[in-house]
Amino acid sequence: MSGSDLEQMYQEVILEAAKNPHGKEHFAPDLASENASHAAETTVQASHEYCTPGESHQFNPTCGDEATIHAEVSDAEPYTIERLVWDGHGCSISQASLSVMVDLVEGKTVDEAMKLAETFHKLMESRGKGLNDEQAEESLEDGIVFLGVSQYPMRIKCALLGWEGMKDAVAKALAAKA
């Protein structure tokens, strides 16, 4: 795929995510948000103290991105991510990355989802060079458009916010089953 094709696809994915973000639901106000200014020094600290099982609150102080990710995992092995939703606000990169992530991991086994998260993280570490692994890049589907973001260290955190939240939310959902 040429650079201009990737740039056009990037624009389309970002615009689509802005208009119709996948997996976004407006959660009822929770204790994390309400207690952020009262019970803890930071929103992140308060959020982690009050999240429910299968839920993770992430905050990027550099950009102001904030998202709460909720994961529901099947009761039997191999554990599958049955439902993945999020609520939050932030820049178009964080919102688009969350939307693409939901499309990629919902319905996958936990192992498959963690492998995709690892692949996306490696893409962000590539500094615009890609993965040199066509199969890995193809596994990211629309997520490959974030290759351009990997050239900007301050924006990498925006793209990774939801992925880190997904990993944490899934881990909490699995821990609640133990």
Predicted regions and their residues:
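C-terminal binding/interaction regions
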Residues: 1-47, 108-178
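Alpha-helix initiation and capping sites
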Residues: 8, 12, 61-65, 91-95
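Structured beta-strand/loop patches that form or line metal/cofactor-binding pockets in enzymes
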Residues: 20-88
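Glycine-centered flexibility sites
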Residues: 64, 88-90, 107, 148
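Short, conserved glycine- and acidic-residue-centered signature motifs
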Residues: 87-90, 94, 155
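Catalytic-loop motifs flanking and including active-site residues across diverse enzymes
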Residues: 93-98, 158-161
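Alpha-helical support elements that line or immediately flank enzyme active sites
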Residues: 97-109
